[in-house]
Structure formats: C-alpha cells, structure tokens
C-alpha cells in the first residue's frame, strides 16, 4: 500500500471520533474540512483546485439557471474539469490526489443538474460531498442525492459501526497482505520459474499476476473506504461488487 493512501486512511480513522463528537448535523462537514486539510498537506495544487471547483460549480449553476444558459454552462464546466485533469496528469512531478474520482463526481453533479434531476446544491452540501475523506482517494463515485439523504438520516448504529470496522480490516488484509506482500513475492517466484520460457508466455504470466495484484489492492482499498464511511454512519454505493459477473460497463462499475 503506498504511503499517500496510508496517510489518508489514518486521517479518516482519526475523523471517526470527530464525526461523532461534533455537534449534530456538522460531523460530515468537519470530515470534509479535515479532508481539505489533508489534501493541502499532501498536494496544495490538488487542494486549491478541488476547493475552488467545488465552490464555483454551485454558484455557476445558479447563475446559469437565472440566465437560462444551462446547456452552455454544463458543456463549458465539463470541458474545464477534463482539461484540468489532463493538464495535471501531464505536469511532471505534480502529486495529484483523487483527481479522477473528483472529476467524475463533479461531472455527475453537473450532468444530473443539466438533465433536471438535481437542483443546484448549496456550497456547503457540495463541499461535504466532494471532499468526504473516506471516498477522496479511491471512490466510490457515489451520487450526491443519496449522500445527502445519508447525511440527514445519519444516526449512531452499533451494528453498522462494527460491520464497517470489520470491512476495514478485511480491506487492509486484501490490499496489504494479498495485493502487496503475497502477490509481490509470487511474481518474483513466477519470474524465476519462467526463465528460459517463451518470451510471450513470460510477459503474459507476469501481466496476469500484476492484474490480479491490482484487483486485490483496489478491491481492498474500496472496502476500506466503504467501511470507514459506515463507521461514520454513511452507507455509500458499492462500486466493486463481483466485477467479473458484469455484463456491461455499467454493471462493472
């Protein structure tokens, strides 16, 4: 597990008592501000862009509604988001944290608003949705409507809390033990075993090992995010539930 993801997980664990000790209705807001602080510590450019885009999007949507320019703003803002994401990826040495998932969440909000499924969220609602710490690094790309309902209905639930903690532990085992330790050593052994074999077979076998490691790492990190959210009283949508059974891209994701 890379150091950056470990830092974010530790910060999210520290946020769990914060979310329950903060006065009612403000716990998730506190988690979002902590998420912004962690981003600022790791990657000031990421923090600056995400904070600015999160504040500007609802204001732009309201202005576009008043001017009756919804389609134009949706197209322009989507272009800005995608351009910023591509520019960040092409900038040498830049640490870009959670950029892909942030961009997808922003596009989801803009898309649902453009199609009339969503009224412009408040700046506060958009901040807590976009900067929710457990989902900041590896998703899932949950819907803002469901997230706001979860925030409103959030209550202490002992069973949900410990179920979330169990899922965090299972996710850590999947990502750290299986995805990193076991499969890294297996790859070394497989490479030694295939010395002298057909080059295509070597490349295929090692690539398969890498993909299996990626599966366990990403599945584990997703489980950690969902478990941490559950410990905060939030149930996020599943985004990695038996992907091998998917019949299309929507089922896969």
Short names for language-model regions:
Residues 1-252:
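Membrane-embedded transmembrane alpha-helical bundles that form the catalytic cores
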């Amino acid at each position: 597990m890379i150091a950056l993801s470990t830092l974010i997980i530790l910060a999210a664990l520290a946020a769990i008592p914060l979310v329950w000790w903060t006065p009612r209705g403000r716990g998730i807001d506190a988690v979002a501000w902590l998420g912004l602080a962690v981003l600022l510590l790791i990657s000031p450019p990421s923090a600056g862009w995400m904070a600015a885009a999160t504040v500007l999007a609802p204001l732009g949507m309201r202005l576009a509604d008043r001017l009756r320019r919804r389609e134009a703003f949706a197209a322009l803002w989507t272009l800005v988001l995608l351009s910023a994401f591509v520019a960040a990826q092409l900038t040498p040495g830049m640490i870009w944290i959670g950029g892909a998932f942030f961009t997808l969440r922003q596009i989801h909000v803009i898309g649902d608003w453009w199609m009339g499924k969503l009224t412009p969220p408040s700046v506060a609602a958009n901040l807590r949705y976009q900067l929710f710490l457990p989902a900041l690094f590896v998703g899932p790309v949950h819907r803002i409507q469901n997230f706001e309902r979860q925030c409103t209905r959030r209550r202490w639930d002992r069973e949900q809390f410990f179920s979330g903690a169990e899922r965090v532990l299972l996710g850590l085992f999947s990502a750290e033990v299986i995805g990193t330790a076991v499969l890294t050593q297996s790859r070394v052994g497989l490479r030694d075993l295939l010395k002298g074999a057909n080059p295509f077979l070597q490349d295929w076998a090692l690539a398969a090992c890498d993909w299996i490691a990626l599966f366990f790492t990403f599945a584990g990190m997703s489980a950690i995010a969902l478990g941490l959210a559950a410990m905060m009283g939030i149930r996020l949508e599943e985004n990695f539930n038996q992907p091998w059974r998917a019949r299309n891209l929507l089922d896969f994701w």
